[in-house]
Amino acid sequence: RSELAAVRKTAGNAGDPNRKVSKKERDLITLRNKLRDDWIKSEYTQVTLNDRQATVYEKGSEQWKAAIEKAAKAYEEMFFKHDVRLVGLICRVQQMRCLTELGRFDAALDCLPDVTDYEESDNAQLRKVWFDSFVLELEALIGKGDLQRAVQIATKTRLTKAEQRTPQAKKILFLRAKAELALAEKLGPDKKKDKAKLLADAKRVL
């Protein structure tokens, strides 16, 4: 407790750019950062326990739905608490996953604005946040029946070479083909060329 009080006091004093910071103060600031990181990790672990609890129930059951709802809410709270940190963005994507599993596709897609900006990021961790959200975006679009949009973004989005070797890339191709096949089924007889193109591309990517 005394260490934590000293850390808080030092952290406040160190905010003055004209003030020389001693080694002891630097050590205390390092300790503060470690304590904060450890606390955030413990928070995240607690949140994921809600998620894991759902696995003991039969998928689709009322108990499963209640557990996933609880997890989605916990992830959302964690996101708003740490939205400027990586862990907050990860929680936003996990919330999106929970909502998609519950069939709440519009609510899941509402999470996207918080993570889509990282598609062009050079930071591998932030890029992964976007990559994970992209897979969920496709699932949500297909789930709500917006097949045209799903096909459009699946065919236009470019993945890095490293991403192309991941299991998620295979899932993206599967979802792309799934959307193309479903969209082809909906096209009328006046759209034979479009239908043939969709079927051919689905066959190619599978």
Where are these regions (language model features)?
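Acidic, polar-rich low-complexity tracts and alpha-helical solenoid repeat scaffolds
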Residues: R1-L206
